[in-house]
């Protein structure tokens, strides 16, 4: 084995105390590729020296063993073919949210020139996807830090997005447009009683305000969005599978479609 293979083995062994063997092997490989800017197969046949980056690797390893997500450690994540900046305090975009983006595009709800808005935008992931598809996009979040991250991502891709700081629950808030072609939101929807089922790195590092809702009113964001945007042509949401019944009742006056994610869980709601 050369230095890179030995180092990968060492990293995977250390990470094995927290991750499964498969995850540890994958993360070890990613760390080496990130540190040296080359695919792992090229590193294996190179004559490079690991000690050039060993302090960086040790620092990343320490953070990972401290339950910090890989995306925060590296400072970026992949989303719908984009490489997005992320940092602690902003929800990490999930594959489930990528699937929501592909659903709205494949069903023709997202098209060039469509007036659209992303509510609870976080890192700006959904808004960026919509803008790349040619839509006219607004994006709203209450968190100044989230908006600063979204702004960096927007600037990186040179897209036009009307980014706004706003509290949807402010009595004085009102939409800029009376009828959007498409309203999309991945709002907080995790019940507090679900905490025990969640990974420590999520609970310890990702923003609670972007995750949790009260157990006694889990659909408050959806209710408020309906109050504000029900005139819009299409509403598309990521949802909690536990709330399907309540959401069906909420949108009793519209056509609703519930869609399962790649894990077979009811994860999306399309209102037309």
Report each predicted region and the residues it spans.
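Conserved SAM/SAH cofactor-binding pocket of Class I
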Residues: 96-195
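Residue-level signal for inorganic ion chemistry
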Residues: 31, 67, 97, 126, ...
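A general structural signal for well-ordered alpha-helical segments in protein cores
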Residues: 8, 28, 57, 70, ...
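Mobile active-site "lid"/loop adjacent to the S-adenosyl-L-methionine
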Residues: 189-220
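Conserved Class I SAM-dependent methyltransferase catalytic core
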Residues: 215-271
């Amino acid at each position: 084995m050369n230095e890179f293979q030995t180092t990968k083995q060492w990293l995977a062994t250390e990470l094995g105390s927290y991750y499964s063997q498969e995850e540890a092997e994958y993360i070890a490989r990613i760390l080496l590729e990130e540190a040296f800017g080359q695919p792992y197969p090229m590193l294996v046949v190179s004559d490079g020296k690991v000690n050039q980056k060993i302090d960086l690797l040790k620092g990343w390893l320490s953070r990972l063993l401290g339950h910090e997500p890989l995306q925060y450690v590296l400072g970026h994540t992949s989303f719908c073919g984009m490489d997005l900046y992320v940092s602690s305090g902003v929800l990490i975009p999930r594959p489930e949210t990528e699937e929501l983006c592909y659903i709205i595009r494949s069903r023709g709800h997202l098209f060039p020139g469509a007036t659209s808005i992303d509510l609870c935008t976080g890192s700006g992931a959904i808004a960026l996807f919509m803008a790349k598809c040619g839509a006219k996009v607004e994006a709203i979040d209450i968190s100044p830090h989230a908006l600063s991250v979204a702004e960096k991502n927007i600037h990186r891709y040179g897209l036009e997005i009307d980014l706004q700081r706003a509290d949807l629950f402010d009595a004085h808030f009102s939409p800029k447009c009376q009828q959007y072609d498409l309203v999309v939101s991945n709002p907080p929807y995790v019940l507090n009683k679900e905490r025990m089922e969640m990974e420590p790195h999520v609970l310890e590092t990702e923003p609670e305000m972007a995750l949790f809702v009260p157990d006694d009113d889990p659909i408050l964001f959806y209710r408020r969005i309906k109050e504000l945007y029900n005139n819009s042509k299409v509403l598309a949401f990521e949802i909690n599978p536990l709330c399907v019944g309540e959401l069906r009742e909420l949108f009793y006056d519209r056509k609703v479609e519930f869609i399962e994610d790649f894990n077979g869980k009811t994860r999306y709601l399309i209102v037309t």
